[in-house]
Amino acid sequence: MDPIDEQEVNVYLPDSYLKGVISFSETNALGSCIIGRPFLKDDFTATTSIRNPLIEHKRIRDTKLVKNIVSNPQYRLVEPLQMQHELLSVLSPNFILHTANLRKIIQRSVDITDKKLNPILHILNLNSPNQEGKVSERLTRLIKKHLSHIPNWVSSWYNIWVNLNNLLQEYRSKEVIDHNCVLTRQLSGSFIHVVMSQYGVVIISKKSKRYTMCTYNQFLTWKDLALSRFNANYVVWLSNVLNTLNEGLGLRCRLKGHLLSKLYISTDIFLSSTSNEFYNVVKEFEGFIMSLILKQTEEALFSTRFYNNMLNNLIDAIDRARLEYLARCANSAARINLPSTDVMIASLGDILSLINVLGESNLNNLSELYFIFRIFGHPMVDERKAMDAVRDNCCETKFLTAKNLASLRGAYVYRIIKGFVANYNRWPYIKTRVCLTPTWINYLDTNSCPSLLEMTEDDFIVLAGVHFIREFHIPKLTDLEIILNDKAISPPKSLIWSCFPKNYIPQVIQDEYARRYCRAKAPLKTRRVLEFYLQDKDFKLDQLHRVVVNQDYLNDKEHIISLTGKERELGVGRMFAMQPGKQRQVQILAEKLLADNILQFFPETLTRYGDLELQKILELKAGLSNKNDRSKDSYNNYISRCSLITDLSKFNQAFRYESSCVCSDLLDELHGTQSLFSWLHLTVPLTTIMCTYRHAPPDTGNNYNVDDIAEQSGLYRYHMGGIEGWCQKLWTTEAIALLDTVAVKGRFQLTSLINGDNQSIDISKPTRLGTRTQSEADYDLAINSLRLISAAYKGIGHKLKEGETYLSRDMQFMSKTIQHEGVYYPASIKKILRVGPWINTILDDIKTSTESIGSLTQELEYKGESLMSSLLLRNFWLYRLYSVDLKDHSLCGKQLYRSLIKVLKHLKRCFNLENLGECLELFLNVPMQFGGADPNVIYRSFYRRTPDFLTESITHLILILKHFRRDLEFNKDNVSKAVLSLLEFTKNDSAEFVTLMRDPQAIGSERQAKITSDINRTAVTSVLSNAPNEIFRTSALHYSSTENELNGIASGVSPVYPHGLRVLYESLPFYKAEKIVNMVSGTKSITNILEKTSAISYTDIIRATNMMVENLTLLTRIMKPGADTSLDPDTIVITILSKIIRDKSWDVGDIIGVTSPSPVSCFKVVYTSTLQNNSVVIERYTTDTYTRGKRGPTKPWVGSSTQEKKSMPVYNRQVLTRGQRDQIENIAKLEWVFSSVANIDSLLNELSTMTLGLSLRKCRQLFPTYLSLNFLHRLSVSSRPREYPSSLPAYRTTNFHFDTGPINKVLTERFGDEDINLVFQNAISYGLSTMSLVEQFTGVCPNKVLLVPKLQEIQLMKVPIFQGGFNLQSIIPIIRQQHMFLPNHITPAQYIELFLSSKQFHSRINLKHNNRFKLVLQKDYFNGENMIETLSTCLAGHWIIILMLMKESQGIFDKEWYDGFVTDHMFLDLQLFLSSFKTFLTVFNFAYLKVGSNIEEITGNQANLLELLDLGYWKNMYKVFSETKVRLALLKQDLSFNSVKNSSSFRHWFINSLQEVQCTSVPWVVNVTRNPTHLKGVLQYMKMIESGMIQGYSANISSVLSIPYNYPDMAHMMTKIIRNRGHMSYDYPKMKKSLTFSMTDMSDSYMLNLFPKVECSYMSGYLDKLDDTLQLLKKPPVGRKVPSVALPWHHCNRYNFVFSSTGCKVSVIDMLPKHFRRSNLKVICFIGEGAGNLMLRAVLEVGGNIKLIYRSLKDPDDHHVPVEFLRLKPCYPYIDTGGSLSLASTDATNKAHWDYLHLHWTDPLNLIVCDAEISGVKHWLKILHRWYEHMTSCKHCLKSEHDKYLIIKYHAQDDLIDLPHGVRLLKCNICLGSKLSGSESYLLIGLGLSNKLPVYSEVLHSKLLLAECHQFHHPKYLDVSGINTNIKSLIPMLDYPITYNKITTLLESVRELSSNKNKNTMWIGRNPVYHNKWLKRKYFNILKWLKYCIELPAFRMDYNSFERIEMLYPNLRDLVDSVSTSELKKVIKVTGILFRSNTM
């Protein structure tokens, strides 16, 4: 670079480093400088750049070409956008050559892919040839066939890109030599000339006689556009080609490429005729596509509204853009006349119709298009205009309503209170008790909190008056993690001028600036937070605390807010601003306090969730909102649901002081600060806000002080609103509180996920449908709630954006992923668009480039998308990179190419390959881990991973090699040779793993990609050790010495176990030191510093490289396998290698880490349906029971995974800082892992005293209650290695079921089979990938895949048991030297404060003096022998804890509690389980649920509590108990379990069984200090022992027993022990035949007498009616009064039966003709039989062992098992329930149904009984038709000569209806037992001449006759169990016999139910409101009715009496209203029992 006179030098960084943002001001400055008058806009930038241009701009101006053009009047100046179309349609003359190149590259990428594909298909056994040859050959043939004519829409974009790219490359290679060069070139084959430099580009078109100036960045963007378009089109073309072979091979979208190309071009043309402002119009396309998506997913109601809205927006956008343009271009040179609106609308119409056609109404296409829109380029961002937009927002007047603000504050208070109650079991301390109403004072005293459903709006107003007292501490010392986020900051006000280039600011200011700059302290000069600290030598850790306490931040003279031009969204007036370091610090602190203390009360904020958790939540939401799955609640209301996705305009700026201080004041009170949380609103209005973008300087008027400069565009004061990103968290929490008020107002349940202004809200509300359809109900709810939300926001000054607020019934659209009906629509093309921009930006670093190509294309494999598309795209670019770009690289010439050739020659020699082409194919297929021959990269890929990763890589390498050379022998030498031939360096035999101990986990799995390599680390440490700031200096020093010190401490402990060391490592200060070094080394600041200091010396590099080489050569040493055994040659090496690595990991010399073998080499994939021995089975769940939409090759499901949480004790945790909490946990972990080491206590004591200042004894009380057993287990299992093919873990969804059971022999004995999933994660992932790939390559997903281990060597390491001792001496100096990294000591005051607030601890501390209590829990329950007992009691404990949890979390995100417990239940002792369940229930009822006042009452109440439990609980429990292995085990103990067929019958069985057992002794969980974790529970339990309720206990209490882990973990552990000891053949306890049903021994005749006598009348005389008699029949019966009764009295004699009672109104045998002989009946078939009561009666009447065929329509909520039949005849052998049939084949109108009737028995079906409820006569006749068909065509039924009959239920119609041909009605039966006003009759139908069906009036006629002349009969005998069940399901507290006294006492207690102390009696359906309102009312009304009935005098059981009874009862209306219809029937059943004694 020529030395230029210092006065002129003014180098500035071009803005190209702000990728993607194109600066308007810079373009304007460049253009104005060149033409000498304003270019784009007449503003101060233009003025300055004309007056004092930058030297770089002058250079371009003075180019000869540019001068000529500017002075030539024929050339017209336009703005850059207007050249876009012309530039992007330039095809170079050698188009054919480029296309040939393209073809060649694709051809090669197909070859390379083929080499990878073959091994994959080989492993999957898919490559066996068929007619057309192998799969892989078919694929390659297919693509090569299409290659001959690559469509124009692919090749032209490639050509355009190559053209632009060549120009750029040429410029870059010139620039390397001459930094200031300006390149002038003609774009090949066009009339376009380009003058290019890094500081600006001039484009001149000789064709259209136009020219323009733009920034370098704009040019890059155009090149990237061409590239992105090529990429998108290439993938679309590939994918379409692949899909022709087999659907699912390509991507799921079916876009049409030529249309895509047309879309790009027409949009370009549209933009090129307009101006920069019109990008806003293009942005509206998104809305259009969204409206198309809604059209697909939603009903018309939802989508049309959005669609119309959107079209209006488009027109508005055009008008707005036009006005903006006219305003901007006044007086500027580049002004044009815009086309008229009509013309624009016409061209827009074309574009939109193109989009419409492209979408093809296919969601996959639309979601792809939705995201593809970045492909049209970026607008230029005008920084000044952005500031003006912000200023306008501020000046807007806001109207806030006081009521809204008050209720917002109230809701915020409510959230905090609720959070405290949930987390700390208490209210926060409050000052103003006065303002609370009595109700709230009551809540305060009981430390409880109502749920939202119980609140009203006034409650919020009441709470708004609450003030808090301080609860949280501000940390005295700054936590270093606060400091270390490397954000940008602004210079202080006095140095603000450093932002602008010198030329742009007046000389006066320049001089003054220079003077001040010299005087300023180092930290003030920097622009990044991190350096601000690094440079500060006076830095004290308590500084920040002082600033906050003294409120220095409120009037800081140096405060300025500067806006930079970096952000993309500036155009719309989003202001991203920076402030000086000091203020930034305060802001960071405020955010941190919020995050640590407050966010936990707002679970809806997304800031808390990681990606996986978020995905899990979204999956749950998708499942919940699925519209195919809508449910009704227990009151038969339809639960309407809708989703809202809202977007608020200018969310942050709309928050004024008024609207945020209502909440921030509360936070200040809680933290004891003054206005810390509203600092923003208090300081910002007083500061100047200024645009500091370098090309947009203010007009200073020579004032140095910013405050004196007049306001202007880009500089203003008195900013009122918020600022983007500064208080995000606070505002998010406010938004959540606001939604609480909305939920209360609208009375619906609302769950939301909120991130600032982006909200996804789900709303549900039970409603009565009335005449509306479900979708109308949903729509009403959506509109109503949108109105409420909109109003609520308006009240606090916010506005909802119309176009971006979507209403939907069932679509999730969060964080830009679209989900519908549970199917995920991942926009794959969007992901690879990024493959464009970096290809050149990072081209300097080929290695990084290859890595990112690999990882970005891998996105295409994600979620089971297309492997082929991914491989072909990746290989295309890799091949181009290595074979084209490397040959002449713009920065390093041929150097890299030479080294590549060197590697290829290695390979060629090593494997005798034929040519270098083949070597390149091999090289590009070697897993990227081998880093393309660069030792640096290969090291980078190894040091972050475990050796598994190594095993995997080598496996892959071998697989691929095997396909290159069939004859290659694989032995250790060849493997080593293969690895080494890829690397160029020599090896060293005596190497050790040098860096390993830095990261004991493995070779550095924790150290993410933050550090590029060790070279960088070395540099960072050396820079840091010179930093002025002491903390950074010492951390660097400590960091370098860590390794030896840690080894010193643990040298005496054996074995040296990496995971164990990790725990120790984290509890010592190194960890923090390393964290600092790590964090620093990843930041931008450090890169800047490194550049400045060039701290990396040559020796450092040599050292680091040597270290890597040594580490790598160690691999070759490890790879010396032992004795060869006879196995597949390729497996052997790897498995042995794997084993060796594993063994070595114990050897102190080389710590490597634990490993598990690679699934690819250890499993053989088998597809069969028969089960093989010893294999992992992966199978699909059956598809007909799916819940979340269909899925197949083209629709993957949403997948996810979860994490468990440790439980913490309930002390007052806010007192501790995060550091202290972590340290406590670390010490607890240490104790846990190393408990077997001799001097562990001394070590812990040392640690806790020195790091926390507490003795170990005190510290123990703060330990987490228990650590999960899994924690240790996780230590023993390796981290999961790479799967193959790489990225499919997300395929792990609900769709598959793994059974690793068959491998049990080897593994499960050691690890219960629930954990095996953890161990076998890699196998499972592998299996799932297999599934996905098979699905892609064959188009069919296999139902089952077996992974058969090739060898028995899959063995897992046990967790080590440590011996020896720690070296304590070495710990003390470490802690003393590095004290600054330790948490503060916990002071005595803090320690006391910890326990003060927690009531539980009060009692715990008092109990310390009570020695008796300490004694109580000394003894262990588990003594080594009583495994089964321990298991059974722990499982009971587990289910009770779940019961408690379900009560507490009335939330929507409930987990599936039964996961992982199936195996444990196999070994249950049922009797013991039930006894302990009963004990726990009693204890917890009393202690926690506060039921009843004394123990006797509770015991009675248990069944009631269980009856009222949410069905979800029983479903969960039934899921476990119905698993085959558990079921079989339980049947051995209790036969009656056989009758359990679904969750409701399970509930019935369980509750009944519970009543048979006594309470027993149970163990209690204690923590390390042997303190009970369920304190109240234990105390209550002791009371029970004292009162002698528990069997086998004297009053001596000293032996309450304990267990050390929580119940589930203890149970798991027992299961493991049982299996290890081979208790598989364990003798189950012999039990009596049945625990519960004594009546299973009832004789058939006894049972028959449980049915009442049936009263029927048979109609005849209707057989051949004439028309005139018909007219008479249609008239209503004369003279008969229909008895008017409101209650379903026909149920009054059915009280013996629970689930159904059809058998009480009709008898099958009575219906049959007299001549029919019972002996003809071998089998009866029942259709639509429900619970099977009629079937039971038939069996009893026919007698003998008759065979039954039972079919009932499968409906998830209804019985499809004959539960009533099984209740009374549990073990009936001859019944075919059709359990395995699908939904279709249980529907009698379907032919399939009739085909499957002879599934089990081939006897003829002489009698079929159909009791189905059939909608519509049409369907009813269809069944008759099907019956006739079957009887006349079925070969089994034709065998019999007897008559064939069908008994069928029929609802008579008003009109005469003919029976179908060949079907004759023989007899019509009308029952007294059916509904009086109904039209029900039972018909006997045979074969014969067809006749007519009875009409409604006839049936009614007969029924009334019956009702008048006959009465109901009681059954002879009673079934007390059934009766009790009926009574309890209505009123749990009541039982048989019912007496007057029982009823009156109950009535009294129900009256008291509302009083507060009994608030928690029961709960239903997780909704406390129902409980408070309905329960009380329901019980009350039913009891009143029963009381009335029991007092009645004797009467006849007929309708006259019933009518009288109803008329005399005054409260009938109340009774009917408070009870649902099904409950009403039960009420009548119970009433019937009362009548039994007093009927005549």
UniProtKB/Swiss-Prot annotation:
Substrate binds at G1728, E1729, G1730, A1731, G1732. Keywords: ATP-binding, Host cytoplasm, Hydrolase, Magnesium, Metal-binding, Methyltransferase, mRNA capping, mRNA processing, Multifunctional enzyme, Nucleotide-binding, Nucleotidyltransferase, RNA-directed RNA polymerase, S-adenosyl-L-methionine, Transferase, Viral RNA replication, Virion. It is found in: Virion; Host cytoplasm. It comes from the Viruses. InterPro entries: L_methyltransferase_rhabdo, L_poly_C, Mononeg_mRNAcap, Mononeg_RNA_pol_cat, Mononega_L_MeTrfase. Interacts with the phosphoprotein (via C-terminus); the association of P and L forms the polymerase complex. This is RNA-directed RNA polymerase L.
